[in-house]
Amino acid sequence: MDRRENDQSLSAGTIEGLKMTANGFYEEIVIAGFGGQGIMLAGKLLAQTAMNAGKEVTYMPSYGAEVRGGTANCMVVIAENEIACPVVGQPDSLIVMNKASLHKFGPRLKKGGLLIMNSSLIDETPEVDNSIEVIAVPADELAVELGNKKTANMVVLGAYLQKRGHLQIETAAQALPETIAERYHETLPVNIKALKRGAEFVSHFSCV
């Protein structure tokens, strides 16, 4: 399996809300926001985490005009067996960091899916099917509390991992050095804290 960092397709557990096929567990995820929010990093980390956990994975980032000032997004597919197509039309899970991303991808989310949104920048009730579970995470505020607003992407990813339960936070933390460029390794501790903070938030959210 080719695991080069710049490869646009990186291919490499009961899980709440995930679909089970004849070939086992299979989930399609879209992560979206605007350029500068670390959308691609979150997608790469999710893909690397799943790969390190022995899953099959594809990762497809969206580059080009959309990334600058508009909606940046990436598609991640995680499965127990070979993935036929890396393109995600209707995601099982959607992580959105801003309103534009919610408006663009919200209508595509499958019934019974999971929506995690950054309520720091999304102050509206999403117009999605009633079967979809919506979790609003004040990611920017939580990241600021940790001392680095740029870790909001890790907060929402931690929330997703905790909610779905198919991958462990510790596995994601261990995958960070492989995902973040070495010159930014001084940020590893705060990024790990952000992953855990997002997970803690969802744990509390589920209990209220």
Kindly give the residue locations of the regions a language model identified:
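Active-site cofactor/cluster-binding pocket
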Residues: 2-208
